[in-house]
């Protein structure tokens, strides 16, 4: 990460090794050096989102408690822990901890110092005037002015529990792989189109795929050579598919335009003669007048 320029990353989305399984890919990573690099590369208004599970999630929060904001809960469609089912409840969730050096608050007060947050899935439920005495609750976190201007108000704000099924079959390429759809949701929540996302433990490349699907740039780091190749091949395959889809859409648009052009009226000799006769009739009418 030392080669990444300062202030060039708009979001870190990372699934660090939890250090709870006795295998090579789940070895603990020192957090202090990571925070030093993450905070160096973050651009204004950016966030760091880290997947975790207890007791590792507590370790994550305590590693930077002053910049910890809140947790999302990822509710899985299938539980784990059947080996210990007679001793404790099955587990069907993981935690996503959100950190940022920038405060949460109203954009009119904080400006570019405000942590970026784009709530997903909002629904318009009514209109209200900006001259209303109520100054809070609008989507962009800005205080309402007193101008007589009608704006939309919204409902269906996100709750902290996110339900996403795990990727299965040929799409499941890593033991701790996170769903692409979940990564897309988080990326859209904390970045805008064209921004850059960093995953310094990218595994099979789900974050990279999600970035391609949402129009973001991606930087991925993976120390395991085998999984690096898996991620590289997967991301390149998705990129190729997206380029092909874009090409097909362009061809469809061109064909639609061609079909429209072909439907334009063609003036045959008979049509021109008929128009000439009509013009002659009008000329005769003018002479009579």
Predicted feature descriptions by range:
Residues 1, 56-59:
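Short, well-ordered alpha-helical microsegments
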Residues 42-48, 193-194:
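Short glycine-dipeptide loop
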């Amino acid at each position: 990460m030392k080669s990444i320029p300062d202030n060039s990353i708009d979001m870190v989305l990372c699934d660090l090794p939890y250090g709870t399984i006795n295998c090579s890919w789940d070895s603990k990573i020192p957090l202090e050096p990571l925070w030093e690099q993450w905070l160096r590369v973050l651009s204004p208004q950016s966030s760091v989102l880290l997947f975790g599970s207890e007791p590792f999630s507590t370790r994550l929060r305590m590693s930077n408690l002053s910049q910890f904001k809140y947790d999302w809960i990822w509710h899985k469609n299938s539980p784990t822990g059947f080996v210990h089912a007679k001793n404790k409840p099955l587990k069907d969730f993981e935690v996503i901890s959100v950190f940022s050096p920038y405060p949460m608050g109203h954009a009119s007060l904080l400006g570019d110092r405000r942590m970026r947050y784009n709530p997903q899935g909002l629904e318009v439920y009514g209109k209200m005037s900006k001259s209303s005495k109520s100054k809070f609750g609008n989507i962009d976190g800005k205080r309402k002015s007193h101008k007589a201007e009608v704006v939309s108000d919204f409902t269906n704000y996100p709750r902290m529990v996110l339900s996403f099924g795990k990727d299965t079959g040929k799409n499941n390429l890593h033991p701790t792989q996170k769903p692409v759809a979940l990564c897309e949701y988080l990326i859209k929540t904390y970045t805008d189109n064209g921004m850059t996302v960093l995953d310094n433990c990218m595994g099979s490349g789900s974050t990279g795929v999600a970035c391609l699907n949402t129009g973001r740039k991606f930087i991925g780091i993976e120390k395991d050579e085998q999984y690096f190749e898996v991620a590289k091949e997967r991301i390149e395959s998705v990129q190729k598919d997206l380029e092909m889809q874009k090409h097909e859409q362009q061809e469809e648009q061109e064909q639609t335009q061609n079909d429209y052009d072909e439907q334009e009226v063609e003036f045959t000799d008979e049509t021109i003669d008929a128009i000439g006769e009509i013009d002659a009739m009008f000329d005769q009418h003018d002479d009579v007048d």
